[in-house]
Amino acid sequence: MIYSTRASILVALVIWGMAACSTAPRSPEGRDDLVRRAAAALTAWNQEIPGVEGFARQSVGYAMFPEVAKGGIGIGGAYGRGVVYERGQHIGYAGLSQGTLGLQFGGQAYKELIVFDDKAALERFKQGRFDLSAATSAILVKWGYAASVRTVEGFTVFYKPLGGFMREMVVAGQSLSFAPR
C-alpha cells in the first residue's frame, strides 16, 4: 500500500513538472512550424493507413501531435506539442505530458492523434478537464511499423511510433493542456 501511494505521488509529480512546459510555441515561426509539421504528419499517416485523415477531418475536432518524445529507466515521461482543430479550423495548441513508473527502459518518439467523437469531449478538453486516465500498458517493442488505436469516452486515440526502442510494463498517466490560438 505504501509503495502504491509513493508510486502515485511520483507519477503525479513527473506529470506536473512536464505540464509546466508551455503548450504553444512562443514565437510565430515556432507556431507556424508546428502547424506545418502536424499537417504533414497527418497526411503521411493517411498514406500508411488510408482513411485516418478523413476520419479526423470529418470529426467534431482533433489534436495532432507530430512528435512526442518519451524515455525512461524505471521512472519516465513524455512530452509533446500539438495543434487542435474544430470542424477543420485551427483553434489552438495542445501540450501532452506523461509520467510513467514501472519496468521500462529506452527512449522513443511517436506521433499521436486524438479525435474528439463528440462536442462534449472537445469542450472538456478546451476547458482543461481532459486527462487520459492511468492505465497499465503491456510490453511494447518498436523495431519496425506498429500502430495502435483505442477508443475511450468521447474520443479515439491513434498512436504510431516514429523511432527508437522502448520496452515497458508501466503505470502511466497522461495529461493534456489547451491554449487558444
Model-identified regions with their sequence ranges:
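Small-residue-enriched, tightly packed secondary-structure blocks
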Residues: 22-181
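C-terminal motif of bacterial Sec signal peptides marking the signal peptidase cleavage site
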Residues: 17-20
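Bacterial N-terminal signal peptides that target proteins for export
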Residues: 1-10
